[in-house]
Amino acid sequence: MFHSSAAPAIEQQPAKLSRVSRITRTVADNLGAVRVFVVIAAIAFWLGGFTFYAGVAVPMGVEVLGGHRAIGFVTERVTNWLNVAGVAALTIFAGNTLLSWRTSGKAVRWTLLITLALMVLIEVELIVLHPMMDRLMVFQPRRDIIDEDKFELLHHVYLISTTVQWFMGMIHVWCICVLLQKRSQPEPRLA
């Protein structure tokens, strides 16, 4: 009987195909996990960082430094980084919203889109307001505010805007949780 050395390679082809499909499936599953991880990390870093800073660091700074004015000069620096983190997180949220568009229900889809749009608009506002407030602050030779009334007005707008942005962020995160909960439920089986 004639044996070809090509025969074993032909017999192994189906095994290779199934191995390739398993690898492809594993990569796809892990990409989903990576996406969820990145979204959760963005939530934790930006919204979590903002919540901790506003709820703990600022009040403690006021207590230790003796007033809002002193902590304001620290806040001026920190909020620049919060805005950078906000732009990064909002970019991640936008990608997640696009990738979730087909799999989410109409109410969740539109809530994600509306909250994202509002957060982006507010982020743009904060980025514009920040240098306007900075120009009213003098750092040398001693820390001072040039125009108290104008600064207070801008600062008040800034605080209201960040509060609305944070609230929109919480609604957005809730919608992400709804999507994750739906993904983790087993699909119903037909009898």
Model-found features: residue ranges?
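Alpha-helical transmembrane segments of multi-pass integral membrane proteins
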Residues: 3, 9, 139-171
